[in-house]
Amino acid sequence: MSQQNLAKLISLAFTEDRVFNDKTSDLCLAKNSQTSFAIKTREPIIFCGKEIILEVFKQLKQTKKFKNSSINIEFFGNDKDSFKSGETIAQGKGCARLIFASERIILNFIQHLSGISTTTNQFVRALNNPKISILDTRKTLPGYRFLQKYAVICGGGKNHRHNLSSQILIKDNHLASSEKNINELISSSKKKYQNLKTEIECDQYFQVLEALKSNPDIIMLDNMNRKNLIKSIKEIRRANSKIIIEISGGINLENIKNYRDLDIDYISIGSLTHSIRAVDIGLDILHP
C-alpha cells in the first residue's frame, strides 16, 4: 500500500468532511473531553484497513486543532484476519472531538475495503481450487485503485494489471478499431514490449486459433459458452502449455463452482471492486 497516496486520500477526506469545523461535536463536547471507543463488526468479515485507521489518527494529531490531543488504540487483529459478528477489531481512548471527527472517515474506508476483502475471500473459498487464482480488474473507483487492489490481496485474491502501462491487453474494441489482425497485433506487441506480458481477449473460438499462431503470454477467454470454453482450453494446452489461461465474464458466487475443475490459471472478476457491498462495521462509544 502506498503511504504517500494514502496520506493524500485521507487529506482529501478531511477537506470533504470539514473535520475541523464539526459544529455538532464542538457544541456537545468540552474541548478536553475524553472518551473510550471500540470498532466492532456486525457481521463476519475479512478485515482490511488497519493502516488507514492509524494514518487518520496520525494526520489529525498533526493539525493545529488536535496537536495537543491524545489518542491511544489497541488492535485485536491485522489485515487479512477474519472476525466474527460482534467481535472487536480495535479499542481505544482519547480526545472525544478527535474521535468524532475521524469516525465516519475511518468507517467509510474500512467498511468498503473490508467488503472487498470479504467478498474476494468468499470467491476463493467457493472456487476451492488453489491452482486457480482469483484476479481483480481495473474497474475501480478513481483514486482508490491502490486501496481496492490491496483489499483484494487481503481477501486471498491477486491483482491483474494496475494501469494501462503495466501490461499489454488487446481487447475486443482494439480489434474492432485496428487495421491489424490478432496475429499481427500480438507479434508487434511481443517485439515492441519485450519486458511486458502480452494478453489477448478472445470471445470466439476462431480468435483463439488465430492468437495461438503468435504465442501470447496470456489468453483471456471472455464470455464464452461452455462448449467453446472447454474447446478453447484444450486447444491452448495442446498448442502451448506455457500460455496462461484466464477466463472472465458473468462469473459470480453461485456459478463459480462450475469452473473449479477447468484447466485454467486465472478467473478475473470485475464485481470484486465495481459493485461491492460495504460490510457492517461500527464505532461504539464505551461507557464506564
Question: What label would you give each PLM region?
Answer:
Residues 1-203, 207-209, 213-214, 218, ...:
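Acidic/glycine-rich phosphate/pyrophosphate-binding loops and surrounding catalytic core
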Residues 219, 285-288:
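Short amphipathic alpha-helical segments
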Residues 223, 249, 271:
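Short secondary-structure boundary segments
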Residues 238-244, 287-288:
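Short acidic, glycine/proline-enriched helix-loop-strand junctions
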Residues 247-248, 285:
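Short glycine/threonine-rich catalytic loop with a Thr-x-Gly-x-Asp
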Residues 253:
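Cys/His-rich Zn2+-binding cysteine-cluster or related metal-binding knuckle/ribbon modules and their
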Residues 268, 280-285:
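Conserved, well-ordered active-site substructure
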